[in-house]
Amino acid sequence: MLAKRIIPCLDVKNGQVVKGINFEGLREVGDPVEMGAFYSEQGADELVYLDISASSEGRRTFTDLVSRIAERIDIPFTVGGGISSFEDAARLLDAGADKITINTAAVFHPEIISKIASRYGSQFVVVAIDARTVASGTVAEPVEATSLNGNAYWQVMTHGGKRPTDKELYSWAKQVQNLGTGEILFTSMDNDGTKNGYAVEAYSRLADELSIPVIASGGAGSVGDIEEVLTKGRADAALAASIFHYGEISIPDLKRTLRSHGVNVRI
């Protein structure tokens, strides 16, 4: 069985990590390259960098930063944010990113998924899906929508979670798998930022319906939350941001605890 992965997420705006940082010993607090190097030394399996200024403000993605990161760290890293074309993705991969993640562009131009996968390989493509639960009957419901307890379904959102779509989580996930994505990063908008745990049932169902890895995002507040989504939720990886950035949980301690509870992680 493949080892479960622990993935810190770094939101970058104007070249700086924007969520609060509380580490000692870093030469440049908030610098994405320094942060990446720190997490690599701590034992992170991968990193995700999201240029949060890109999608909303139409900024070009941070190619120069990607090159600096690739020169400095020795673990895989994924880059996303504002990738709206094959050319955007190619520029980042050629600059040294191990994978790219696309969200809004995948919804409006799904052929991008197949084009990147055909050129570089499926393993280079991660489709990010942001979704929220919506009460049935309150919006125009997708035909394929599957209700939760008979009264709600998971509605896919775009543009940083600001715009609703006519897509439903599980059917969209299967569609992007068929288009060639190698991995899915699903963020529950209901759970994101709450620190009350992940949407475990949703991840468990995704594990049933997909043959590609799923990264869990949104809701990590404790070691127990991460353990639950990796075991009960059967996610292949757990992504978190603030609990790592604020030093609430250290990656070495997290991995030791997971290993002691029988979860297969790399130490």
Could you say what each language-model-derived stretch is?
Residues 5-9, 46, 74-78, 99-101, ...:
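Structural preference for beta-strand elements that scaffold enzyme active sites
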Residues 11, 39, 47, 79, ...:
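Conserved, mostly hydrophobic/aromatic
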Residues 12-14, 18, 98-186, 190-191:
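Conserved anion-binding
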Residues 46-64, 104, 185-196:
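Glycine-rich, proline-tolerant flexible connector loops at the mouths of alpha/beta enzymes
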Residues 77-78, 83-96, 100, 201-238:
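Catalytic cores of alpha/beta
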Residues 113-120, 230-240, 244-267:
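C-terminal helical cap(s) of enzyme catalytic domains, especially alpha/beta-barrels
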